[in-house]
From Swiss-Prot:
Interacts with MinD and FtsZ. HAMAP family: MinC. Cell division inhibitor that blocks the formation of polar Z ring septums. Rapidly oscillates between the poles of the cell to destabilize FtsZ filaments that have formed before they mature into polar Z rings. Prevents FtsZ polymerization. Keywords: Cell cycle, Cell division, Septation. Belongs to the MinC family. This is Probable septum site-determining protein MinC. The lineage of its organism: Bacteria, Pseudomonadati, Pseudomonadota, Gammaproteobacteria, Alteromonadales. It holds the Pfam family MinC_C. It comes from the Bacteria. One of its GO terms (biological process) is regulation of cell septum assembly.
């Protein structure tokens, strides 16, 4: 029997959501550039859904926002929580209208394996623990990336980027003896350096998700 040339199947994907709280395109562009300068590879080519729940004006420049994002190699696939007139505008420029989903009743499958790295992770290196947790017995240097579908434990200083719950596991955590990271992310929610610097507990801590926000708690040394 000949295989059909196409098949339509249901599936789900984890997308980052960009919340827009201003109508000033210059301000949006400047703030976006500052974030991209800190972690360019993390955002490069990232598909985004734009949340416009904070925008109450019908003359919002959606096309201008799209151009700002695409010119920086970010891919806007749709918008959510927007006014009806903005939804109509989105359809006219080829963007999807994404409905806010209900909280998932089933969490992603728990990690099955643990990857252990018994050395420092140096600048330019990327370590990925697929379908499992990642344990680094050593430091993660500036410019290095550690990624896991589960949790990340660093028995040393975390100075690079750490992305846990990469497959959507919201129960994942990031634990490190010293957190001086360029970026930390759990299931798509992220903090950059400035957020961590504001939190004194981050010297030795555990980062986790509470709702849609990251939190950090100090650990005994």
């Amino acid at each position: 029997m000949q295989t059909p040339s196409l098949e339509l199947k249901g599936s789900s994907f984890t997308l980052s959501v960009l919340h827009i709280n201003s109508q000033d395109m210059a301000v949006i562009a400047a703030e976006l550039d500052s974030k991209l300068a800190i972690a360019p590879q993390f955002f490069l080519g990232a598909p985004l859904v734009v949340n416009l729940s904070a925008i109450k004006a019908s003359d919002f420049d959606l096309l201008g926002l799209k151009e700002i994002l695409t010119s920086r190699q970010l891919i806007i696939v749709g918008i959510t929580s927007a006014l009806p007139v903005i939804n109509d505008m989105a359809k006219s420029i080829g963007l999807a209208i994404v409905k806010s989903g209900k909280a998932a009743t089933n969490q992603p499958q728990m990690p099955k394996t643990t990857k252990i790295v018994k050395q420092n992770v140096r600048s330019g290196q990327q370590i990925y623990a697929k379908n499992g947790d990642l344990i680094v017995i050593g430091a993660v240097g500036n410019g290095a990336e550690v990624i896991a579908d589960g949790s990340i434990h660093v028995y040393g200083a975390l100075r690079g980027k750490a992305m846990a719950g990469a497959a959507g596991d919201r129960n994942a955590v990031i634990v490190a003896q010293k957190i001086e990271a360029e970026l930390v992310s759990i299931a798509g929610q992220y903090w950059l350096t400035e957020h961590l610097q504001q939190n004194e507990a981050a010297q030795s801590g555990c980062i986790r998700l509470e709702g849609d926000s990251l939190t950090v708690e100090s650990l005994p040394l």
